[in-house]
């Protein structure tokens, strides 16, 4: 009987082994940061300090096994299950993984507000346009990553890779 949990095949595994497989797949899930269309940093969910709560996962897997044992059929078909889980986060690991120096050699510019200046040369006032900066604000970046990963976990907890585009939500 083929069984997948959030798209991850755990067929033929006992509760403990399935739990290990799920936790490893979760922690090894790639997170790719892109800026201006190219990759600038790659890490994993685990390196960002995220993990699945072992107790919650074991309870959910045990309950699923009991449910499946009660409804055993001769010709069971493949089924994908979504079980209860809890994500834990290590703030210190996340801070260490999301420092500005991880994001390439690109020269970063400071944001500048629009302003009006008097040009002595032209003898008139000139509007200097606002310039969006590219300096990374680490706190804003962490909040942006947290929100992005939270949404990703709802859609694809264990499969695929997360792509995060650096933009104004992560800049100062």
What are the residue ranges of the model-derived segments?
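Surface-exposed, secretory/extracytoplasmic low-complexity segments enriched in Ser/Thr/Asn/Gly/Pro
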Residues: 1-172
């Amino acid at each position: 009987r083929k069984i997948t949990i959030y798209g991850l095949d755990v067929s033929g595994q006992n509760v403990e082994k399935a739990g290990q497989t799920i936790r490893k797949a979760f922690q090894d899930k790639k997170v790719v940061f892109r800026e201006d269309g190219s990759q600038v940093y790659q890490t994993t969910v685990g390196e960002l300090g995220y993990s699945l709560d072992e107790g919650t996962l074991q309870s959910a897997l045990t309950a699923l096994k009991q449910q499946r044992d009660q409804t055993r059929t001769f010709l069971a078909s493949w089924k994908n299950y979504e079980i209860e889980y809890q994500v834990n986060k290590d703030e210190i690991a996340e801070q260490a993984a999301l420092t500005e120096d991880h994001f390439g050699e690109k020269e970063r510019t400071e944001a500048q507000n629009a302003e009006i200046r008097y040009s002595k040369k032209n003898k008139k006032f000139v509007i200097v346009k606002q310039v969006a900066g590219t300096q990374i604000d680490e706190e804003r970046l962490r909040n942006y990553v947290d929100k992005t990963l939270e949404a990703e976990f709802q859609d694809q907890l264990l499969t695929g890779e997360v792509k995060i585009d650096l933009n104004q939500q992560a800049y100062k």
